[in-house]
Amino acid sequence: MVCREQLSKNQVKWVFASITCVSAVAIAAIVLAITLRRPGCELEACSPDADMLDYLLSLGQISRRDALEVTWYHAANSKEAMTAALNSNITVLEADVNVEGLGTANETGVPIMAHPPAIYSDNTLEQWLDAVLGSSQKGIKLDFKNIKAVGPSLDLLRRLTEEGKVRRPIWINADILKGPNMLISTEVNATQFLALVREKYPKATLSPGWTTFYVSTSPNTTYTRAMVEKMHELVGGVPQRVTFPVRSSMVRAAWPHFSWLLSQSERYSLTLWQAASDPMSVEDLLYVRDNTAVHQVYYDIFEPLLSQFKQLALNATRKPMYYTGGSLIPLLQLPGDDGLNVEWLVPDVQGSGKTATMTLPDTEGMILLNTGLEGTVSENPVPIVHTPSGSILTLESCLQQLATHPGHWGIHLQIAEPAALRPSLALLARLSSLGLLHWPVWVGAKISHGSFSVPGHVAGRELLTAVAEVFPDVTVAPGWPEEVLGSGYREQLLTDMLELCQGLWQPVSFQMQAMLLGHSTAGAIARLLASSPRATVTVEYDPAGGDYASVRTALLAARAVDSTRVYYRLPQGYRKDLLADVGRN
């Protein structure tokens, strides 16, 4: 009896122990399943074509969608380097793919992890992927140095993805265009590369770049407009996300081109990379940071420069440096934010002439400067600013005073006299060369062209020609003369304006009168916005034309077309009424 009772007690203990073990295994399995299959992760943040920031944010490896938080491990090719990378806290592994024995009698066609000129390695791509996918959650960037490696590698990636093993973003990189200082062609064939990706592994982020070479005797050589436009021509129609690798030592001098490139698609980003021998300025990195949204640019930069850059970039008291030809994002408008939040302001001027002083409102926004000319062209004319009070301030004094004011501003020069156009642009160019223009600058006028030709206004062709020749780094802001708007914005008026502005690489903001929108061709605003990814519309209203109620419907209709790309140049009271209406709706 005692033995039976003892046996029963032992059996009970074993039963409880077995239940405990099974429960522990079940709990572990559930936790693992939840970790690997968090809601939305499998189809979104953890897919090979997912946004890298969304993926790392879902894992808690970055704290916000800021590409500066992403860290990189270079050339994780050999088994030793790969192991070191896997044991690090780096978030993305970058490795080079070549073909074993490339160009020799021993060429096998097997993708290996090696940077040219190396053609042998202790690590094949398959071994590398097995290790990285099986033991880490790090993002992956594969750099292809030869077109022969691309097809077999993408076949392998597709098989592993179909087996459910690739559950993270994959970046596919190759230099497909000749870039700065390259005298010979070493790039991967662009047509073949893009075709292979499209055929074999389209669900990945593309990383197409330019071959480059830094020459210390030509430090200012950089990417040309033609190089950047050719790249957009190649990949503008692909459905994938695209991140363009750009040599960081060359980016500042080519910023007008890369600013244009980023504006062409929300799918685009840049990845700035640094060669070990490149001289690099932290000011250049800060300039890029200031002129982009935080999710648009990754920084693959060496220490200690990277830490220095991060410290300065995240310093809220640092005075930023904005590109004069850039958009109002992120200076005055956050990505995806409402254009109604950007306010147009007119400075208060006391006195006149050289002793005049300017007072700015407490709020931030676009500073509207109605610009004329003092003197004639033959008398060394001076651009001046006309104010509602009748005071006159030289444009140079106005801009220099603005340079000393803290806060976020944009400048909107409205050319009131045709003769003031080129002298005003020349002044902008000179101040920019002296480092005294740190804000986006718009240059606009009511222009004469085609069906809206009216004497006394700036000729449309002259506006564009003067900008191109004297100071191209601006936003062009053309409007129609009031004399031709009796029937609103008719079809021919829109057609002629769009034909004039066709092919502009600068941003353009079409200036429209709110009172006339209700009498205009249906879809006028939508048609103007569709002309370019960089196009915006600014709706203005003169209170002498009537009260807010008379334009309320037109203003709300304009905002309904695109709340992010329509701006409002309104009296403060009207703007408050519109904000209240938007809030109620």
Swiss-Prot record:
It is found in: Membrane. The keyword Cell inner membrane does not apply. The keyword Nucleus does not apply. GO terms for cellular component: extracellular space; membrane. The chain crosses the membrane at residues 14-34. Belongs to the menorin family. This is Protein FAM151A. It comes from Pongo abelii. The lineage of its organism: Eukaryota, Metazoa, Chordata, Craniata, Vertebrata.
